[in-house]
């Protein structure tokens, strides 16, 4: 079940987990097996598990894949809030997601070998 998998080595209270599940729209699936959830719900469970880890660095690979616009916005807000004290590398194919989430943006293309790194300040000062 979702809740049981969330508490493996966790020391955090179930109260915080319930709040975070509500924030991500996962209320009501606490006792379901992850394999029974939709793709979008599984994605949010994966984000929840990653963000609750006691790690200084997180790699988030396409964390918004399969999410509708409203759920994507909630998930972005959750990651921003929970990730304030963490270093995160977020991989995405969506430049708008990168601009919304990143302090620094690295774009690369295999086709023409372009690698560009910018500080994300909406004016994007290149380094």
Predicted regions mapped to residue ranges:
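Conserved ABC ATPase "signature" region
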Residues: 12-29
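Conserved ABC ATPase signature
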Residues: 33-37, 41
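Helix N-cap at the start of a conserved alpha-helix in ABC-type nucleotide-binding domains
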Residues: 69-70
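Conserved signature/switch motifs of ABC ATPase nucleotide-binding domains
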Residues: 53, 84
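Catalytic Walker B motif of ABC-type/P-loop ATPase nucleotide-binding domains
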Residues: 58-62
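Conserved H-loop
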Residues: 85-92, 94-101
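Hydrophobic anchor residue at the start of the ABC signature
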Residues: 47
